[in-house]
Amino acid sequence: MSHNDKNTHNYQISSLDKIINDSSVAIEFENVYFAYTEERMILKNVSFTINDNEYVCVIGHNGSGKSTISKVLTGLLKPKSGVIKLFGIEISAANLKYLRNNIGIVFQNPDNQFVGITAEDDIAFGLENRKVPPNKMWDIINDAAVATGIEDLLKKESLELSGGQKQRVAIASVLAINPKVIIFDESTSMLDPKGKNELKELMVSLRDVAKKTIISITHDMEEVVKADKVIVMSNGEVQYIGTPQEIFANEERLLKMQLDIPFTLKLAKTLKEKGLKIDLTLNNEELIEKICKN
């Protein structure tokens, strides 16, 4: 690359940085279609918007297309047609490598994403790939470990960690490279109840404290309760978009799409039908308080 080409490249990156930092909209899908073959369309005319610093759950039955959304967003798959924008910038082959720096992803199986010998090595891996100077690495690793509650696990090897702890290491590895968007692709599905609850709380903290945009692709209705927005997928199409309260208000509609409502809401409905004076709620503590007052 010549000196002039390098200056032009740096200017382009600087311009993209400004657009990203100034944008209040994190992600836009506009009429996106995707198919592995002509016979079967996986995504059909998918359109939605996710704001910066928003926690969004994408739900749907198996085969609904929800996981394909993360793959086309990260450039692992190329849409057949339509536009995908990240912070106002249309994703293309020319800028994909740069834009990927602003997206982190945590997968379903924690064992498949542990690449280092120890937790500390695993977090350092992404930093080494980005040529972060060794003298700056420790502070970044420590900050990511503190944010995910694994500062006491940094010297532990993979075999010494539980599934939930490995997922926290994976999240710390993502946080260390400081993306603006973090995608959780069925990240709680292989965890025990304790690990699931801890990860759900961490997602909320990443939105509230770290100011990240969180996208969780999930079939766990208990997780959806804490989201700002829910996108419901079925047969490759967006069926509904709304708050958790709006989405769960129509149980019959969800059941037709092979989805359920959270246990707390289900219990509140049952108690209300049995005569208790209880308003329907998605909040456990609120339900307990109302039961105690009856």
UniProtKB/Swiss-Prot annotation:
GO terms for cellular component: ATP-binding cassette (ABC) transporter complex. This is Energy-coupling factor transporter ATP-binding protein EcfA1. It is found in: Cell membrane. The keyword Magnesium does not apply. Pfam families: ABC_tran. The lineage of its organism: Bacteria, Bacillati, Mycoplasmatota, Mycoplasmoidales, Mycoplasmoidaceae. Signal peptide: none annotated. One of its GO terms (molecular function) is ATP binding. SMART domains: AAA. Residues 27-260 form the ABC transporter domain. Belongs to the ABC transporter superfamily. Energy-coupling factor EcfA family. The keyword Lipid metabolism does not apply. Keywords: ATP-binding, Cell membrane, Membrane, Nucleotide-binding, Translocase, Transport. The gene is ecfA1.
